[in-house]
Regions:
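A conserved beta-strand-to-alpha-helix junction within the catalytic ATP-binding
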Residues: 1-10, 67-68
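Conserved catalytic submotifs in the C-terminal HATPase_c
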Residues: 17, 22-32, 69-71
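Conserved micro-motifs of the catalytic ATP-binding
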Residues: 33-36, 100
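Short beta-strand/loop element within the Bergerat-fold HATPase_c
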Residues: 61-73
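Short helix N-cap motif at coil->helix boundaries in the Bergerat
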Residues: 84-92
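Short alpha-helical Gxxx[C/S/T] motif in the catalytic ATP-binding
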Residues: 108, 112
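Detector for a conserved hydrophobic position within an alpha-helical segment of the HATPase_c
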Residues: 116-117
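Glycine-rich ATP-binding loops of the HATPase_c
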Residues: 120-126
Length: 147
């Protein structure tokens, strides 16, 4: 999982640089393995990173931070310092085909949630306000291996 996220960061590195976005990946421990469909999980993380990038459009000090933390569960937090999600829209963002964008279908976050649930995890918005949005993916201990 850590390697996949690192590779996505490398894949998007020129996009991050062109958009003045600083990408940070923090993982303790460094090697975490999840049994599942690597393509689907990569699709989830790519979608979340792209959404964060869109929320940072026009900023010159954009930051996206992905943190992997193991306690009684594996927590993956994706934080950005973008424009945030208005309170009145926060309940709607996981509804299929809901979008506020002029482009796109509005299935991204709904699809992400479905994929994570199929892999035994949970996916939710922890916090969003102007200048800070945090999405969380959590997996129970039985779903991952530390090496």
């Amino acid at each position: 999982l850590t390697n996949s996220l690192h590779n996505l960061g490398l894949l998007l590195q020129s996009d991050f640089e062109n958009a003045h976005i600083h990408f940070i990946l923090r993982s303790t421990p460094s090697d975490i393995y999840i049994e599942g469909d690597e393509k689907q999980l990569s699709q989830v993380f790519l979608n979340l990173l792209k959404n964060s990038m869109q929320s940072l459009e026009g900023k010159t000090d954009g930051q996206i931070e992905v943190t992997l933390e193991v306690t009684n569960k594996l927590y993956i937090r994706l934080l950005d310092n973008g424009r945030g999600i208005p309170m009145e829209l926060q309940e709607k963002i996981f509804v299929p085909f809901f979008t506020t964008k002029t482009e796109g279908t509005g299935i991204g976050l709904s699809l992400c949630r479905q994929i994570i649930k199929r892999h035994g995890g949970n996916f939710y918005l922890q916090e969003s306000r102007q200048g800070k949005t945090i999405f969380v993916i959590e997996w129970p201990v039985a779903s991952f291996i530390l090496k």
